[in-house]
Amino acid sequence: MNTYNYLIDELHILDDEIISYGKDKFKIELSLQERLKDKAPGKLILVTSINPTSSGEGKTTLSIGLAQGFKKNGKDVMLALREPSMGPVFGMKGGATGGGVSILEPSLDIDLHFNGDIHALTSANNLLSAIIDNHMYFGNELNIKDVYWQRALDVNDRSLREVKTKARDDKFTITAASEMMAILALARDFKDLKERLNNILIGTDKDGKDLFVSDLKCADSLALLLKDAIKPNLVFAKEMVPALVHAGPFANIAHGCNSVIATNTALKLADYVITEAGFGADLGMEKFLHIKQPHLYTKASVVVVVATIKALKLHGGVTESNLDEPNIEALSKGLENIEKHLENIKLFGLNSVVALNKFDTDSEEELQFLKNWARINHLNYGISEGYSKGGEGTKDLAKLVEKVAYEPSKFKRIYSNEENHEYKIRKIAENIYGAKDVIFSQQAKKKLNQYKHLEIPICIAKTPLSLSGDPKLKGRPRDFVLEISDIKVSLGANLLVVLTKGINTMPGLNNRPRALDFKLDDKGELI
């Protein structure tokens, strides 16, 4: 019996519930959820962050490190994480499998093609586009006039934001921000997946009537392409921590959470499940709590807020090129950003732990300053050194998170789905972001009226780099106005997607993309 078979046996996964993709990557059959339906779920730990630097806060690294700390303390723990998109891997941010000792393996495989889920999603997405265009070409029996559905690709390519063909104008979105990705992430089972695919709003006819995938009668073909992609992927982090890595919607331009199926499966397999929501608490956490959590077996027991001294200094006015230099004044000023995120967690009635992701460049003076700040403000505060030490560097943080997870809390939503859409948008903008007002374009107002009958959650697409809609406004912006440029409805995902000014769902590469830095030897190995 090899190491992985032994680890899978330890998880009490049966032989007919596991599918091998090589020696170190696996998928889990959906039948496992049915077998364990009567088992009580574990504790759910949600990891979020402050508004990050352009390179991120190390949320995935800390999540993995925290799980390693739980295991080091003898606890039964599992990770439930998003799978990476190739766009950022070759763009600015890089991979999304952690780093240092706190990393998923095989990291490069996971960062690229993994088990083929994103390829399957892209294929299903573009098959639907082809079916729509083909229907219009051969007679257009449905009288399709306006097509809402967009093509998708898992590459950052700004040239595809607007595409003109002989038949019609079209657009591409990155697969991670597509409705197809959101559907996979939110589906509870295969039956639910098919229902959601049928509910996709593809456009309207010449009389303005809504048209759906069900009208084209092609949902089963789309589901066929996704029949394996819906099964959660199992891999292991260093120190043999199990991780279900499945679905990867971005948090700035989508809802930013891994799949419901993976998280629910983890909750049945482990006593403690650590999951993350993309970017800061203003984006991923809010969407997790309003959009994903209602489909889970349990609610989050505690929220871990990841911060770095670098990001706090950035919010205190330091430029990114000078973040390695000690600066207590900027650090002190930047604390207003994390303080707002902690206030937001309280708005939801949840308890929090501040987790500092420690870097070698952090000075002792800065570390002591933060420790004193946390003590004075009676905060749960710990340090993660998972990157360099793995579980040994996070075991104290893990003990703190475990303790807080058992403290009483009473979750409450910021809005209910039944409320007016404009009211829901304002509640998020004013309460979570701190906006003084929200203004809507004429196009957005038209869409609000068009979809006023829908009782669905809100998914706001905005910059992750600021609490506001302007990435240049650092710290805790006040007296700003959030501008809404457009609104889209994703009825398969059951979301009202709200686009703030300047947001694109197809990113572009930066001026020096990471794609220029990869080097391989003659055997195809990374140098």
Swiss-Prot record:
Its EC number is 6.3.4.3. It catalyses: (6S)-5,6,7,8-tetrahydrofolate + formate + ATP = (6R)-10-formyltetrahydrofolate + ADP + phosphate. InterPro entries: Formate_THF_ligase, P-loop_NTPase. GO terms for biological process: tetrahydrofolate interconversion. SUPFAM superfamilies: P-loop containing nucleoside triphosphate hydrolases. Pfam families: FTHFS (PF01268). GO terms for molecular function: ATP binding; formate-tetrahydrofolate ligase activity. Gene3D superfamilies: Domain 2, N(10)-formyltetrahydrofolate synthetase (3.30.1510.10), Formyltetrahydrofolate synthetase, domain 3 (3.10.410.10), P-loop containing nucleotide triphosphate hydrolases (3.40.50.300). Pathway: One-carbon metabolism; tetrahydrofolate interconversion. The keyword Oxidoreductase does not apply. Keywords: ATP-binding, Ligase, Nucleotide-binding, One-carbon metabolism. It comes from the Bacteria. ATP binds at T53, S54, S55, G56, E57, G58, K59, T60. Belongs to the formate--tetrahydrofolate ligase family. NCBIfam families: PRK13505.1. This is Formate--tetrahydrofolate ligase. It comes from Acholeplasma laidlawii (strain PG-8A).
